[in-house]
């Protein structure tokens, strides 16, 4: 049993991308579904599919690769706020990742969103991860 399911999710995606897997299957939760939707909307993954089992369900993610270099679009994905050390950021202090080339995923009172959208809505929250 793992103590940080979000870190497990990010690690599975990172490892699958580094190993050039086309699809990765991950146990589902509402937060993982929202992170997956954000990654899809921002163009980091090709597609996703939620499968409901009797107990928990799973998420199948099709990873996206560059057509020329055959490298993963996800260069790195880092967990920032951890269960033992939460990292919060106000709307004015949400970081820009790689000068705007990456995204920060932030958990706000209005739900999970990118750091850019959180700045536009003027809300802060817990910085879940960086993707670039």
UniProtKB/Swiss-Prot annotation:
<keyword id="KW-0694">RNA-binding</keyword>
<comment type="similarity">
    <text>Belongs to the universal ribosomal protein uS8 family.</text>
</comment>
<dbReference type="GO" id="GO:0019843">
    <property type="term" value="F:rRNA binding"/>
</dbReference>
<dbReference type="InterPro" id="IPR047863">
    <property type="entry name" value="Ribosomal_uS8_CS"/>
</dbReference>
<comment type="function">
    <text>One of the primary rRNA binding proteins, it binds directly to 16S rRNA central domain where it helps coordinate assembly of the platform of the 30S subunit.</text>
</comment>
<dbReference type="GO" id="GO:0003735">
    <property type="term" value="F:structural constituent of ribosome"/>
</dbReference>
<dbReference type="GO" id="GO:0005840">
    <property type="term" value="C:ribosome"/>
</dbReference>
<dbReference type="Pfam" id="PF00410">
    <property type="entry name" value="Ribosomal_S8"/>
</dbReference>
<keyword id="KW-0689">Ribosomal protein</keyword>
<keyword id="KW-0699">rRNA-binding</keyword>
<dbReference type="GO" id="GO:1990904">
    <property type="term" value="C:ribonucleoprotein complex"/>
</dbReference>
<dbReference type="GO" id="GO:0006412">
    <property type="term" value="P:translation"/>
</dbReference>
<dbReference type="InterPro" id="IPR000630">
    <property type="entry name" value="Ribosomal_uS8"/>
</dbReference>
<comment type="subunit">
    <text>Part of the 30S ribosomal subunit. Contacts proteins S5 and S12.</text>
</comment>
<keyword id="KW-0687">Ribonucleoprotein</keyword>
<dbReference type="InterPro" id="IPR035987">
    <property type="entry name" value="Ribosomal_uS8_sf"/>
</dbReference>
<protein>
    <recommendedName>
        <fullName>Small ribosomal subunit protein uS8</fullName>
    </recommendedName>
</protein>
